[in-house]
């Protein structure tokens, strides 16, 4: 989950108009690269702009920066409190048990950040060895940033890893501090098939989005262009004609006047749904987002401050709220989707209050104060509590028993209630 400081600066939902920006600190290298592309082919989509700014192999924000923590541009929930990761670890084991206790369990995290979440989950796995028994557990991390993969390796293995060339499906491997095999991949497609619990914690919000605006001539795409009055600036423009994206990505029943669509998120969710349907398992997606109600959420962050999205590309984090209604549509009928449910509700359903009482009773006053502060950050509706959402994708067999058995005999999905099932 992105930095708590973001929560105090919500962006207004307005229609896009032509706009420009400048900065003395603009990343001239990537700006020159973007300008060359625009001159050659015309204005580019917001999705292409985000892709270049964030994941360009040489100049991208995620490729060359350590953007996490107090010195970076955002802080995540696992870094705020270990309780968060512990409860997600309990959720993973609960779903593994409910699905029949497969003899092998792959824990797959998309965009693992510093590795804090996986680290907390592995601690829970170690504490509950008696429950997991002889289950063959392996850890699989999907990470595009070389810098972050090194940070994750240090956190999870003590940096005892080996790197590989492109002839391998994984580019790094090792053994965790708890003795489990761990692998790093560039793409989810490279992760081995098998029963898996997928975690995507603040992953989907950074994927490239297309932006669309309803006009008197129909839907048009918002594009990024060079400001003709100042070649050192970028600006937003609205396409005069339909684009392939505006012709294919807008839902027929769309009623909003401005829409953001993350086609890449749809593709990834379809892959997750296919794997879960065929191999078993579950996915838990955690992000700030909405259920098809918001319009303009595209924004940038740099040094824990709101930052113009067109200024200094490659030097700032770019993000947009996740549209969970779109993820649900892309998952299709082959799986069951639960949520979104607020972080506050999910963590309370998972027993965070009981866990807090145990920790508060066994620590000194200074640690208790820190625990209370962390709890407030995670649960308070004005902070992370209502802003962030939990969404799950499950194998249809997980809840199929409802048709043949009384509800009291069916193991509920931890963290979710019946009202959240769609």
From Swiss-Prot:
Top EC class of this enzyme: transferase
Pfam families found in the cross-reference section: Methyltransf_28
Lineage top rank: taxon: Eukaryota
EC code(s) of this entry: 2.1.1.320
Catalytic activity: L-arginyl-[protein] + 2 S-adenosyl-L-methionine = N(omega),N(omega)'-dimethyl-L-arginyl-[protein] + 2 S-adenosyl-L-homocysteine + 2 H(+)
Main location: mitochondrion
One Gene Ontology cellular component annotation held by this UniProt entry: mitochondrion
Gene Ontology molecular-function annotations: protein-arginine omega-N symmetric methyltransferase activity
Subcellular location: Mitochondrion
GO biological process entries: chordate embryonic development; mitochondrial respiratory chain complex I assembly; peptidyl-arginine methylation, to symmetrical-dimethyl arginine
Phenotype on disruption: Impaired NADH:ubiquinone oxidoreductase complex (complex I) assembly.
Swiss-Prot/TrEMBL keywords: Methyltransferase, Mitochondrion, Transferase, Transit peptide
Transit peptide: 1-28
General function of this protein: Arginine methyltransferase involved in the assembly or stability of mitochondrial NADH:ubiquinone oxidoreductase complex (complex I). Acts by mediating symmetric dimethylation of 'Arg-118' of ndufs2 after it assembles into the complex I, stabilizing the early intermediate complex.
PANTHER family listed in its UniProt record: PROTEIN ARGININE METHYLTRANSFERASE NDUFAF7, MITOCHONDRIAL
Similarity-based family: Belongs to the NDUFAF7 family.
Protein name: Protein arginine methyltransferase NDUFAF7, mitochondrial
Organism: Danio rerio
Name of the coding gene: ndufaf7
């Amino acid at each position: 989950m992105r930095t708590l400081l973001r929560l105090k600066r919500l962006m207004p939902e307005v229609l896009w108009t032509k706009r420009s920006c400048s900065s003395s600190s603009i990343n001239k290298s990537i700006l020159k690269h973007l300008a060359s592309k625009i001159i050659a082919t015309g204005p580019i989509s917001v999705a292409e702009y985000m892709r270049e700014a964030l994941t360009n192999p040489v100049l991208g924000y995620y490729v060359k920066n350590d953007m996490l923590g107090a010195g970076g541009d955002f802080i995540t929930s696992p870094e705020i409190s270990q309780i968060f990761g512990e409860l997600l670890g309990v959720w993973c084991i609960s779903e593994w048990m409910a699905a029949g206790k497969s003899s092998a369990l792959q824990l797959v995290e998309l965009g693992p950040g510093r590795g804090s979440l996986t680290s907390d989950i592995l601690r829970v796995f170690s504490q509950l060895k008696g429950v997991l028994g002889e289950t063959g557990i392996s850890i699989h991390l999907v990470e595009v940033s070389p810098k972050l993969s090194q940070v994750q390796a240090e956190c999870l293995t003590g940096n005892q890893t080996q790197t590989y060339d492109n002839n391998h499906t994984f580019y790094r491997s090792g053994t965790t501090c708890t003795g489990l095999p761990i692998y790093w991949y560039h793409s989810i497609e490279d992760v081995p098939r098998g029963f898996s619990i997928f975690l995507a914690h603040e992953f989907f919000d950074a994927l490239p989005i297309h932006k669309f605006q309803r006009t008197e001539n129909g839907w048009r795409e918002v594009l990024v262009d060079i400001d003709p009055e100042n070649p050192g600036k970028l600006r937003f423009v609205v396409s005069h004609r339909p684009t392939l994206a505006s012709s294919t990505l807008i839902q027929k029943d769309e009623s909003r006047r401005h829409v953001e669509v993350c086609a890449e998120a749809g593709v990834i969710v379809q892959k997750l749904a296919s794997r879960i349907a065929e191999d078993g398992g579950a996915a838990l997606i955690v992000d700030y987002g909405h259920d098809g109600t918001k319009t303009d959420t595209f924004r940038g962050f740099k040094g824990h401050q709101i930052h113009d999205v067109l200024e200094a590309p490659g030097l700032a984090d770019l993000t947009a709220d996740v549209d969970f209604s779109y993820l649900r549509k892309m998952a299709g009928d082959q799986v069951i989707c639960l949520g979104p449910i607020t972080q506050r509700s999910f963590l309370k359903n998972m027993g965070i209050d009981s866990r807090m009482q145990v920790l508060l009773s066994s620590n000194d006053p200074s640690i208790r104060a820190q625990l209370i502060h962390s709890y407030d950050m995670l649960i308070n509706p004005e902070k992370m509590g209502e802003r962030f959402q939990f969404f799950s994708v499950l194998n249809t067999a997980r809840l199929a028993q409802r048709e043949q058995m009384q509800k009291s005999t069916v193991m509920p999905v931890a963290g979710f209630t019946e009202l959240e099932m769609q």
